[in-house]
């Protein structure tokens, strides 16, 4: 799959004739191939690399799909046998790719849309399988730091007058307070959110409906400000259409994602799908569940079982801050546990990616 195509051309005998195309291959190796500059290979396209006497060639591939359930032992996809040395590559439209073991897909049902391409060997067994974000493992997971960072941005954007003053317009300040209050009511602080999930005052159904899309978040925000002035509504729309800095903890380290648009994330667990160059392609909210029971590779919330990701992150929320920790350091009797799982629609997704421990009263 094409990850990048560089127009920094290579000179051959004084003439610019080649461009570099970076391709993620099913064996897990990323290869760079030089091809004619007139050819076009957009990020995410499926290609095949061949080598002959004239050098390397890159050919585009048409989609070829298959569907079925991966057997428990990872040796078959529906009625089709998987070769013992099968190469499986999960991919995203933004150019990310990663190899997948058959055991990772054990028991997973793949639809035709989950499989972008496959090939068979001389025995008719599938020996290469390219997936379409079927695992969810290519996303980056973490927790969003206190959302007041975004609230303060909304407030400051509405206090300025045309001359840039933030103190000379009383109506502007009033509008600022209304917008900040509206944003804060739909985007609660992390503490409000976590304790609200624990005590049930914030329902999962409401949470999911508000964070399903940026439009849903904007709609909810505008309903809150429906009785306010036109200026407030305009300010809310301006707020939703502008970019933001998302301060997060990822694998225990604080990092900031700068985006040109707002995404429907409020607080707690989030997921980021990056481009091949490392910028943000999209961002989504993880969905929360209160954890009643911890298992070796799963958790239970009521009667529902959720598998945990192998690289699940664990955080302690204490006095307004996140602290990276491990399960062995958490005493479940003293802490309420909130699991955050991905709901992107990945066939082998839906795993708990982040676990947050909140001190009980």
Question: What are these language model-derived features?
Answer:
Residues 1-361:
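...the same signal can extend to comparable exposed beta-sheet modules
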